[in-house]
Amino acid sequence: MLPTAIVLTILLGIIAYIWGYPHWLDWREKQLFQRPLPPHWQAILGDRLPFYAQLSPQQRQKLEAKIQLFLQQKQFIGCNDFVLTDEVRLVIAAQACYLALELGSNPYPRLDTILVYPDAFQVRQITSPDGYVVEEEDTVRAGESWDRAGQLILAWGTIAWDLERWQDGHNVIFHEFAHQLDMGDGAMNGVPKLGRRNDYQRWQSIFASEYQQLLSQLENNLPTVIDPYGATNPCEFFAVVTETFFEKGQELQHNHGQLYQVLRKYYCLEPLINC
């Protein structure tokens, strides 16, 4: 009897955690909504992130609450002797939270740790181009998202570069955190967690068409608004068009209207207007 009671107690505890944790996060975010960031943190956001000034007062309050919750939940680790500062943590957290401003209290449930390198880092990539021969090569990366390890890796040098070049269509933080959103439904396939079945059907139809259009443009050496790296696979396409949406929104809307509208509906945000 005793083992059965213990098992039942454990199961009830797990059920209570699964049910209660999201509610606790909602409650915690509402509590933090009433607590603004320190003035010197607000000054950093205003100085480094153009979108901060464009937010409505309510959106700004919401962003600041999400930043505080994010910093409490996620662990930051400096790698290769990189020294983490409040500014580093704040700049990363703010962009991650801006991306998911309207996506609930826990948009990155699989993420535990953010590793920050001073500059681009090397990783060993194992591929099998023909399905049989395994090839290994060292590649240089500015960021990487790992699902199973609960880790995300960023290079501060690339982040600093991006901060000086808003609206160039490149943002490593948006890119890697879009991958995290992609994992929200348990699979990294270029389709994040959506609402209704119709949303999935529309998403897959438009994204498949736009992905093929990008491949065709590149094959014919035509100019593209979307970075060519998006043609790597559907996962990278979603991450790349997220960068494009937030940094080159007007161009995306003009050239890829349906794709723009799908992303606008998902993120529930208007992209940057003037930076």
From Swiss-Prot:
SUPFAM superfamilies: Metalloproteases ('zincins'), catalytic domain (SSF55486)
Entry's transmembrane regions: none
Pfam families with a match to the protein in the record: Peptidase_M90 (PF06167)
GO MF terms held by the record: aminopeptidase activity; metallopeptidase activity
CDD domains, per the entry: Peptidase_M90_mtfA (cd20169)
GO CC terms in record: cytosol
Superkingdom, natural source: Bacteria
Family listed: Belongs to the MtfA family.
Record's protein name: Uncharacterized protein slr2042
Species, as recorded: Synechocystis sp. (strain ATCC 27184 / PCC 6803 / Kazusa)
